[in-house]
Amino acid sequence: MITMKDIIREGNPTLRAVAEEVPVPITEEDRQLGEDMLTFLKNSQDPVKAEELQLRGGVGLAAPQLDISKRIIAVHVPSNDPENETPSLSTVMYNPKILSHSVQDVCLGEGEGCLSVDRDVPGYVVRHNKITVSYFDMAGEKHKVRLKNYEAIVVQHEIDHINGIMFYDHINKENPFALKEGVLVIE
């Protein structure tokens, strides 16, 4: 079971490396890793399990954050509707690639955080509002999905991890809250 002690922190060189492609068909080891990553995210969002296991809440996790330089990401985004228990996006992506993106940019009003970053980093992280992503699932099936808004932001954050990019690399160094005209701010 993955816990916070398994997650490496900023400064570790694995977080700045471009991760290796995962062989398809997916090996049992890589499938299990993906499953464990998704379980961590689900546990981190369950108040009882999160407290019991001392987990910080997360919606995404990339293999490099576990000091494993492979192109594997897991995302578990809860529904916006409090009545709906079904997550809006819950999957493991092997070798995800952004095929296309919108011209429209977006950012979270509260900024972004990261399980590998133990400090608050204020500022807007500007990303594409809509993306089309291809990836392989645990069974080795290829998928192509269109994502927008928060789901697109989460997946871009995790894909950055497999490319050696941290969220704060996107923040304007001179003026962290400067935005170009037309950027949507999601609260």
Curated annotation (Swiss-Prot):
- Enzyme Commission number(s): 3.5.1.88
Q: Which regions span the lipid bilayer? A: none
Instruction: Keywords in alphabetical order, please.
Output: Hydrolase, Iron, Metal-binding, Protein biosynthesis
Active-site residues are: 158
Pfam families given in the database record:
Pep_deformylase
Q: Give the residues the record marks as binding Fe cation.
A: 114, 157, 161
The protein's required cofactors: Fe(2+)
The UniProt catalytic activity note for this protein reads:
N-terminal N-formyl-L-methionyl-[peptide] + H2O = N-terminal L-methionyl-[peptide] + formate
Q: Which terms under GO biological process does the entry name?
A: co-translational protein modification; translation
Q: Which Gene3D superfamilies match?
A: Peptide deformylase
Class of the enzyme per the UniProt entry, highest EC level: hydrolase
* Molecular function per GO: metal ion binding; peptide deformylase activity
Q: Cite the cofactor comment.
A: Binds 1 Fe(2+) ion.
Function of this protein? Answer: Removes the formyl group from the N-terminal Met of newly synthesized proteins. Requires at least a dipeptide for an efficient rate of reaction. N-terminal L-methionine is a prerequisite for activity but the enzyme has broad specificity at other positions.
Would you identify the family this protein belongs to, as annotated? Belongs to the polypeptide deformylase family.
The name under which this protein is listed is: Peptide deformylase
Q: From which source organism is this entry?
A: Enterococcus faecalis (strain ATCC 700802 / V583)
Which lineage ranks, top first, belong to the organism behind this chain?
A: Bacteria, Bacillati, Bacillota, Bacilli, Lactobacillales
